[in-house]
Design a protein with these regions (language model features):
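N-terminal targeting leaders
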Residues: 2-161
């Protein structure tokens, strides 16, 4: 049973080492990133989380190591703790888009190991709290980091984490 799991992890490691560059020739995006809403015109655009080739290799190594350890210990699903991040990210984005309370906000989402980071702009503190509660209730979300800004915002693009 352990050999197929180790083989799967080795294939995952090889795939993680070869991501496709997304924006610039020397940057890579490993985690799913999506804009859910765009209703706050004054909100600066959030840039996706990108890595240099060196950062990407270090991240790939630690991700494979983490996945192998928890798989062998039986504390997580084999195949990596990042396996379901794209579907979690899409589900969270859809939930935000489908909730009328957030139509006047601009919200970007990044998911890493079932940890969801919210960035962008909301109108009120109450809206920020409601957004966080909505995201926490989504299936498979382990943790929410709500980095949204309330009200008027500073100018210039924000870098996603």
């Amino acid at each position: 049973m352990r050999m197929p799991a180790l083989r799967s992890l080795a294939l995952l490691a090889a795939a993680a080492a070869l991501p496709t560059p997304l924006f610039a020739t020397d940057t890579y995006q490993l985690d799913p990133f999506e804009q859910a809403t765009a209703g706050f015109a004054a909100c600066p655009t959030v840039a996706p989380p990108t890595l240099t080739p060196e950062q990407m290799r270090a991240q790939a190594h630690s991700r494979v190591e983490r996945g192998t350890s928890c798989c062998l210990a039986g504390t997580c699903e084999c195949g990596g703790s990042y396996k379901h991040d794209p579907e979690i990210n899409a589900r969270v984005a859809a939930a935000i888009r489908n909730d009328r309370r957030f139509r006047d906000a601009s919200i970007w989402i990044t998911t890493t190991r079932k940890f969801v980071t919210l960035q962008g702009c909301v109108r009120t503190t109450a809206q920020k709290r409601s957004l966080e509660r909505l995201v926490r209730r989504q299936p498979d979300v382990a943790l929410v980091w709500n980095e949204t800004t309330v009200g008027p915002v500073r100018h210039g693009p924000l870098q996603a984490k």
